[in-house]
Amino acid sequence: MLKSIQRNGKKQKNGSKDKEPTPPKEQPLVNGNHDMNGHASDSVAPTEQQNGETKKKSDSEVMEIIQDAGFTVQIMSPGVEPLSIQVSSMELVQEIHQLLMDREDTCHRTCFSLQLDGVTLDNFAELKNVEGLKEGSVIKVVEEPYTMREARIHVRHVRDLLKSMDPADAYNGVDCSSLTFLHTITAGDILEKKKGRSDSVDCTPPEYIMPGAKERPLLPLQPGVGKKGPQPLKVLTTSAWNPPPGPRKLHGDLMYLYVVTMEDKRFHISACPRGFYINQSTDDTFEPRPDNPSYLCHSLIDLLSQISPTFRRCFAQMQKKRTQRHPFERVATPYQVYTWSAPTLDHTIDAIRAEDTFSSKLGYEEHIPGQTRDWNEELQTTRELPRETLPERLLRERAIFKVHSDFVTAATRGAMAVIDGNVMAINPGEDAKMQMFIWNNIFFSLGFDVRDHYKELGGDAAAFVAPRNDLHGVRVYSAVDVEGLYTLGTVVIDYRGYRVTAQSIIPGILEREQEQSVVYGSIDFGKTVLSHEKYLELLNNAGKHLKIYPHSVLNDDEEEIELCSSVECKGIIGNDGRHYILDLLRTFPPDVNFLKLDEELSKDCKAFGFPIEHKHKLSCLRQELLEAFIESRYLLFIKHAAFQLQQLNTNKRQQKQDTPKEETKAIEPAAKEDSANNNKEEPAAKKGEPKAATGGVPKVETEEAKKLMESLLSSDEKNESREVVKRACEAVGSLKDYEFDIRFNPDVYSPGIQHVDNPNAANSIKKQKQLVKDAAEFLVKHQIPSFVHDCLDHTAAPMDGSTLTETLHSRGINVRYLGKVANLLAKIKQLEYLHTIAVSELIIRAAKHIFVTYMQNTEMMSMAAAISHFLNCFLTTATSVSSESDVLTKSGSSGKQQRKQNKRTAAGGGKGGKSSFQCTQDNNEWQLLTSKSLWAQIQQELKSYWDYDLLPAGTVDSADPVVTHNHLQKISLLRAFCLKTGVQILLREYNFETKNKPTFNENDIVNVFPVVKHINPRASDAYNFYTTGQTKIQQGYFKDGYDLISEALNLLNNVYGAMHPENAQCLRMLARLSYIMGDPQEALAIQQRAVLMSERVNGIDHPYTIAEYAPLALYCFANSQISTALKLLYRARYLATIVCGDNHPDIALLDSNISLILHAVGEYELSLRFLEHALALNIKYYGEKSLKVAVSYHLVARTQSCMGDFRSALNNEKETYAIYKQQLGEAHEKTQESSECLRHLTQQAVVLQKKMNDIYSNGKLTTGLPPIHIQPPSMGSVLDMLNAINGIIFVQISSKEIANLKNEIEKRQKEGGAAGESSVAQANQEEVDRLLTETMAKTAAGIPFEEQDNYELPLPAATTGDEASSSSKANPVASSS
């Protein structure tokens, strides 16, 4: 795919310039969303394959793969010029085939073969295996005769070409199409634009993005919508005369088509082995013989061009436009991305679309031998592929990802068909909620409590949550990837109020009862329990990574059964001999804060208001939390043992009083403080976070403790050492006496399970329970407060509910704690914006819970009216349904009413075939909802689920008081609600304040999409390269970092194809590195791809996409594209205000960027409005004395001085000076610069005042006064400032410092004598590091440097202080793959 992108004339920008990456061999043809939690990480623990040895090999393997020799071949096609293309020996012949079908001059051919010296090439052969193929070989394109299948593929391809410019597929959420507007905003490809001069820039921002604007229009969300492209044909469809009758088949007829041209002529066309021709049939008469002339052509496009001049002209225009589009605008995404708003679309006649809808197959299915796919076999076979070497792992991961994304697409389509009543149940006689379905070799079940299976755990509420928990289990077991242990392909789909679980089918499971199939686990929640030797071995291996503790339980016959998972986890050996596990809903231990137990919780948990009794008993702790908890306990264990050992040594050496005292100093306080089971100061221990790495203890102490532990292990006094370890194990709750072992028993609080217990052992059930309680307490006592504390520096400021949820999940905090988090945030003024986002997310989730039931009680005919009524009740003051709905409901004749009644009766309370998901209750029930009743339900749900009080009872009768009190905005609530529930609304302006008519009517509800949750297979080698690259960057080796991340991107392209969120992240990092290393043009090219990709795979208004716009604007400005830079920043600010309003730290950064560029082009008044808003936000979120605020004051002063308002400028610069003086000291360079600036402004103000006095007194100017200098800023100084506020700082080292550096190095060389080159290099590096540290402070506030002959050394922002961290999104070190 990537190869074909490059051949389309786009220069490859990611890797090294002298080599091209190996393209993926297969394309994902398919669709969906982010992974189940929105975050793209499925890492559990490094698999056994990624050990040190493999890693050593991997560098050379990667180079071998990526530097694979390319060569040039010539392609000769009939009727077009010969074409030279660069190919790789690892490519398949199929890829040349695909390339030709994509090129402008050959795209209309599909049925052809490629021949070398008269020999037809095998499509699935690698080029290196083709005999005689070498540099300069000529490959001929030979037209082949059509078969029925080939003719259908050709027609489908022609139809795809004709609608390639039509965005309908993206709006309808089909064929992995999605929207992108970057090129609409920038009016074409940025790279092809000429540099703009500042005097010719149109830079007026639209009124709605100005600071303080209350209006939030929706139409600019999708600019340029409604522009119609060229239309080549009115109708192209299959004819109603199909299929050809027997006699005509014997004459070679394959199929018939019907065409209406733009000239309004109608033609019937026959397909035969030689191509397509006009026949003599009409709409009423079947006459299949060739017409005169018949225009026989091998390609349908050639035929249509002959019969319609308009088609010939329009098709050429369309092709030109299609090939001008960036390849990233056309490539399919791996999962379908849905948009929450859409314009009114024309619905055209399209027989192929109709055929796809009503066939039971999946679009591409007829191209695959054997028709429907055996999903289970495909999913499991790909996991069994070898994985020893890098090429093997790449092939395996690519195959896993490809099959998985296809499976997600098929499962989503099947789930919609099930709920739409388009699939027959396998148990049609049962109640609708109990029905199960099989479609396309996928098993579908509904989220209801069938046969009281979850009665003890919360009934339907538990049944609704169980699939999501099961998916968590599948995710972690898949990521651990133990050889020989298999999980089912699993996708959870929420659609129209129903939760559907789609699973691949274990071979043979449908042939026997479940009781006969299960060889491990329990099917009745612990009454009968089975164990199996092989399963114990496999699950024990996986359990080591997942921290699951092996335990024994008693079955009904009082027999002892050993388990290495929860009791519910079932093991089934399929007919294929594979060991499958399913029902993984209790993979992780229960969350005791949400269970009513006989036991007491700790004081801290009680103080937080726990336990809260949930509707279900399936609340589990997250894996991220368990990892953080175990790491924290391990550090505690080390410190305890070290402290005990010190005391032991002290007692031995009483005669030496001084030494032990000093030794003990480092650890004693920490160990004593920690010896209570948990320590308040101990923050999150999450891998990859610097604080976590030391558990909150100063580094010296932890290092000291580790050294002491080493001496402990080598100690001769074994018994004393054992005692020390034993006491440390007891202190941290280890499940072994003489070894640190913290794992969790997921069944420890399961009702009805009898555990085998030894009360006096280290692993007694009491201790196992205590560990689970401690982990829940750790979440409340450490993770939540440390999350709130870390938010105070605003480095990763979530912008909406999805990014907030993602951040919480990364720390192991479940969303059910969001009420408690919101209460904490409410107390901190600097986190007001985050409190608003948290409350908004709580309201949306509560509304979604109510909406699910509401949708289930609504019949299909009233769906649009019911959804619009719900939105009216939710966001406005609504009492009754809109008049149109009333008409719909009341106007039916009595016969119509009777028919509906009969239909409901026939359904028998929901029993039976296809009407099963039509509502079986009175269809008027939804009309009874009012704003008051809905908000009462929302408040009740918030209290029962999150223990959160929105406002005092009785004060909420509509959205208005809630919106006002919590600083929410209705457009953001509408967006979030639509994304959560899958509702798509009409793109128009909505007036939420209208009183006399409803805001929403049924015509505003365009569609309802599925919301899909699934696992995200990971490209492990690419991830390793990426993280190594990040480490290099943090050490200051940018070129090495760049090369490693380029290789990571090549590997990602290999595994995921060209489109994936992780690819976008890689591109952003490469663009930033290119910019830091002094190549802004390269940075611009790469960042443009990052923005396009983010729009396609994350969504046009996703916070990640918004974050990609600001760097692109910076790189545009650096390339003198000023107008484009402003348009991009306006777009980013508009999207941010739709998502979260303009009260957010990221808005301050955007406003500072906008104001600087407006300042550069002389729009001082506009610039000042944005600057003052940025200043107000910075004061609010960073405090009045922060360096960010100092910079904002300075920028305001600079702009005011350019406007001639010296008095105001003087006042603002005084604020800057005061902050610098307080924070950096009077002697600091920045303070001196500010002082100089004050002197200059004072001088200018005095001159101005004298001139004014002169005019007032004499009516004319006296000569001799110096002129007033209002110097417009240079583009260079503006760019310096832009770099600084975006966290990119080029450290300046003066000539004097360089001289010092040289002297120091020479001195060391003399001292070291012949120490060799390596020591000199090391000395050099150390001295550079020292100088950098000293000089970083000079640039921390980012004011432009005075012109001087300086040496520049670029440094990424992550290594500097306040200013550098101003944007985590732009911070090259902050992101991770």
From Swiss-Prot:
The organism's place on the tree of life at top rank: Eukaryota
InterPro entries membership: CLU-central, CLU_dom, CLU_N, CLU_prot, GSKIP_dom, GSKIP_dom_sf, TPR-like_helical_dom_sf
Please give the GO cellular component terms listed in this UniProt entry: cytoplasm
Gene Ontology annotations of biological process type: intracellular distribution of mitochondria; mitochondrion organization
Provide ranges: composition bias, Polar residues. Answer: 886-896
User: Per the record, where are the segments of Basic and acidic residues compositional bias?
Assistant: 655-690
Query: Could you tell me which residues the TPR repeats occupy?
Result: 519-552, 1022-1055, 1148-1181, 1183-1216
SUPFAM superfamilies this protein is in? Hypothetical protein c14orf129, hspc210, TPR-like
Kindly indicate where the leader peptide sits in this chain. none
Primary site of residence: cytoplasm
Region (Disordered), start-end ranges:
1-61, 651-700, 886-917, 1310-1377
Record keywords, A-Z: Cytoplasm, Repeat, TPR repeat
**Which segments constitute the Clu domain?**
353-595
A GO molecular function assigned to this protein is: mRNA binding
Name-wise, this protein is Clustered mitochondria protein homolog
In its UniProt entry, the species of origin is given as: Culex quinquefasciatus (Southern house mosquito)
